[in-house]
Design a protein with these regions (language model features):
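Acidic, small-polar-rich N-terminal luminal/periplasmic segments of exported/outer-membrane proteins
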Residues: 29-164, 573
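Outer-membrane beta-barrel channels and translocator barrels
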Residues: 65, 190-192, 202, 246-250, ...
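Outer-membrane beta-barrel translocator/receptor signature
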Residues: 106-108, 120, 129-138, 143-239, ...
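Transmembrane beta-strands of outer-membrane beta-barrel proteins
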Residues: 167-169, 195-199, 253-255, 355, ...
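Transmembrane beta-strands of outer-membrane beta-barrel pores
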Residues: 171-175, 201-205, 259-263, 361, ...
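Solvent-exposed loop segments that connect transmembrane elements
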Residues: 207-230, 267-339, 383-392, 431-451, ...
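Outer-membrane beta-barrel domain signature, strongest for Gram-negative TonB-dependent receptors
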Residues: 228, 234-417, 425
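Structural signature of Gram-negative outer-membrane beta-barrels, strongest in the C-terminal barrel
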Residues: 244-248, 408-409, 420-424, 454-574
Length: 574
């Protein structure tokens, strides 16, 4: 997949302002040693027998990274898979990925933010701001992190409230009318209560110039005049608030909330529109660029426009063009010719609340986290990418999830241990369809639209020990059992479409296909590894088993089906 990178920092102006404690922004070596929590405890990255790429907040700032997807440029063995010009993206770690980008499908690479799992694959693309560090763990991580981490995971840890007052503000101005502001402030609010408030806004102007006539395409009920809009713009806002409460000398309670809102234009690619030229007998004798057609129609016969827009002969092969007589734009410059170009077709909104309790008892540490997230997404695009907007794809999704984790940990002279319980609930409502007939490819007419609901409940118990066989040799063993229940309802409705730009799902009509099904699964993950320390080096070899829960497919035009769990066993030494 090719990602459009505008090198925002080329013309960037950055202002960093310390509200207090100038030492917070003192020059440091950004490649210093990093502490990670890959094994649910704070450890130096060089002491962990896992393939990890980690970034501190200072490193992220020095590299100019502003989005989670930009991490792949600096992480070996990690890439992105996706579609719609990069607007739907899934992490690929060591080749473990999937090609189902529907919002109800969870990815085999798990993504966490501050200990909270992101169930939606589309939530994996988010802006980076006020981040303490990011850890990318490669290989199965099912023992401690659970389901759907067969390929690995991306763990983002944000900056936390501080006792001393500190903060920063950054402003960036860059090419294509990009203006980005990021800032945070942290400090003590009252005795034993600390707060941190951070956020950012990014306004990105249109990168692609659309030479199609403004307003030439019909209106849409999504609220925008069609045609002519320049493309690949971005409007993102995000905010995070955290309150940290001291609970005596042994514990703390962290309450946090987050909100984000993103608006993007639709996928940028489309072939160059053409107009066919016919002689008096109706034979196609030429094809010209639509931009050179003064009559603004698909077909000109004997000098007269005989067909309006999108009504010409769909099959008119021409030298250098495709079967429909259209031409590839060749990707030269920043120009496109798109009739279906609306400025607000892709919207993503998310919000979340979390409460995290840490408490140190005399013989063990206790951790509890309650986490709620809500994710909404709307997508619209001309899916066929031809000169005529014949197959307008749209999807809408709402995902609500709640997770609860209880974890216990401790250590003695020869043993480190961690164990716990985990619960996850996900409710997904998802619809998708084509605003145009999938059989005749005519605008309007009958269309098939899919409407599905998926409810997931997952329960697990897990544990892992690190036992010192000698001063230099450690045996690591872990096991996780997961019970997962899924309830699925899917319907395909065929509706008479009166608007060729918007899908219309009428649930009062008879469903062409219905599937009501449930699936219960018993899953297990495991880890067995030996670690040997020599001087400042750590050598390890082991076996890891990860699982991704089975679920239900919901293709665009129906054909619902259950797919089995995925199992991955990895043998690794390093």
């Amino acid at each position: 997949m090719h990602t459009l990178n505008t090198h925002k920092r080329l013309l960037a102006l950055t202002v960093a302002m310390a509200l207090s404690t100038p030492a917070a922004f003192a020059a440091e070596n950004v490649w210093e040693s990093i502490e990670v929590t890959a094994q649910k405890r704070n450890e130096n990255i060089s002491d962990v027998g896992i393939a990890i790429t980690a970034f501190s907040g200072e490193q992220l700032e020095a590299l100019g990274l502003e989005s989670s997807t930009e991490l792949i440029a600096f992480t070996p063995g990690v890439s992105l898979a996706g579609d719609i010009g990069g607007q739907r993206a899934i992490f690929n770690i060591r080749g473990v990925v999937q090609n189902d980008y529907a919002d109800l499908a969870e990815a085999p690479v798990a993504v966490y933010v501050d200990g909270g799992y992101l169930a939606s694959t589309q939530a994996q693309t988010f802006g980076l701001f006020d981040v303490a560090r990011i850890e990318i763990l490669k290989g199965p991580q099912g023992t401690l992190f659970g389901r759907n981490a067969t390929g690995g995971l991306v763990n983002t840890i944000t900056a936390k409230p501080t006792a001393d007052t500190e903060g920063y503000a950054e402003f960036t101005a860059a090419r294509f009318e990009q203006y980005r502001f990021e800032g945070a402030i942290s400090g003590e609010i009252a005795d034993g209560i600390y707060g941190r408030f951070s956020g950012f806004t990014n306004q990105q102007g249109e990168i692609l110039e659309n030479i199609y006539e403004d307003g030439a395409a019909p209106d849409t009920r999504l609220g925008s005049v069609g045609g002519g809009e320049d493309g690949y713009n971005d409007d993102t806002k995000a905010f995070r608030a955290q309150l940290l409460f001291d609970i005596g000398e042994e514990g703390s309670l962290l309450l946090s909330g987050n909100w984000s809102d993103t608006t993007k234009s639709e996928g940028p690619y489309q072939v160059v529109n053409t107009t066919e030229i016919k002689d008096a007998d109706g034979n196609v004798i030429d094809v010209i660029y639509a931009a050179d057609d003064p009559l603004g129609c698909d077909t000109i016969q004997a000098g007269v426009c005989v067909d309006g827009n999108f009504n010409g002969d769909p099959f008119r092969p021409v030298q250098g063009g495709d079967f429909n007589g259209n031409f590839d734009p060749d990707g030269s410059g920043n120009k496109v010719n798109k009739d279906f170009a609306f400025d607000d077709q892709n919207k993503i909104k998310s919000k979340g609340l979390a409460a995290t309790l840490d408490y140190a008892f005399e013989s063990f540490d206790f951790f509890a986290m309650s986490d709620y997230k809500e994710f909404k997404r709307t997508v619209g695009l001309d899916s066929d990418q031809t000169a005529s907007p014949e197959l307008i794809f749209q999807s809408n999704s709402t995902i609500e999830q709640f997770s609860q984790e209880f974890r216990f940990s401790g250590e003695s002279a020869d043993l480190k241990w961690v164990g716990g319980l985990y619960y996850l609930s996900i409710d997904t409502d998802y619809s998708q369809g084509l605003a145009g007939s999938p059989t005749t490819f005519f605008l309007g007419g009958e269309e098939n639209n899919t409407l599905v609901s998926l409810e997931t409940e997952s329960y697990s118990v897990f544990g892992q020990i690190d036992y010192s066989l000698s001063d230099d040799l450690v045996l690591v063993g872990g096991l996780r059992y997961t019970r997962e229940d899924k309830d699925f309802v899917g319907n395909v409705y065929q509706n008479e479409n009166t608007n060729d730009r918007v899908i219309e799902i009428d649930t009062t009509t008879t469903s062409l296909e219905t599937l009501v099904d449930s699936n219960d699964q018993n899953l297990w993950s495991a880890k067995l590894q030996l670690e040997y320390s020599v001087g400042n080096s750590l050598y390890y070899a082991g076996i890891n088993r990860g699982v991704k829960a089975g679920s239900f497919n919901a293709p665009l035009q129906g054909g619902f089906s259950l797919y089995e769990p995925e199992e991955l066993t990895a043998y690794e030494a390093g």
